[in-house]
Amino acid sequence: ERFFDGIEKFKPVLISWNGNGFDLPVIHYRALRHGVAAPLYWESGENDREFKFNNYLNRYHARHLDLMDILAGYQARAFSSLEEVALMLGLPGKMGMSGARVWEYFREGQISDIRAYCETDVLNTYLVYLHFEKMRGLLNEAAFSTEKHRLVEFLKAADQGHLQEFLSQWLDGTGSA
């Protein structure tokens, strides 16, 4: 519900890595199962013309940028993992965790480890997104540096070990902040 409430309130652009292939379908099925209403998310122009050619559901629209899909030119054979792209950019990547282990961690009650994994995935995705925006010419070098600096300051202020480890590995890598 909170996910869809945020969409209703802010109309954000969603940024993901394989969001079309995993995250959003999981959210869709859970919303269906629990009867969660999300009219703006599902809007495709019937009630709001603004969404006819730019909505959250169409693969080629800009309200949801699935970076894996876009960077691969919408060709499944060209997909790369977030880990591969993050490491290529000098980012920490998965830091030893894998999505394949989430179910095991869940069964063992290691919810905080799953949360840490998801949060570092978000950080990697955000930093890949900044590189993407720079590549598209939507961020110049100064804006790119400013955004990275903001993230460094946020991570420095965080008192969670996995965020400190992410920052340390990022600053030690070739994708220096």
Q: Predicted segment positions?
A:
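Metal-dependent phosphoesterase core characteristic of DEDDh/y 3'-5' exonuclease domains
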Residues: 11-116, 120-142, 154-160
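C-terminal accessory extensions appended to soluble enzyme cores
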Residues: 143-177
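Short, basic/hydrophobic alpha-helical segments
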Residues: 1-10
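Generic alpha-helical secondary structure signal
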Residues: 7, 33, 130-133, 148, ...
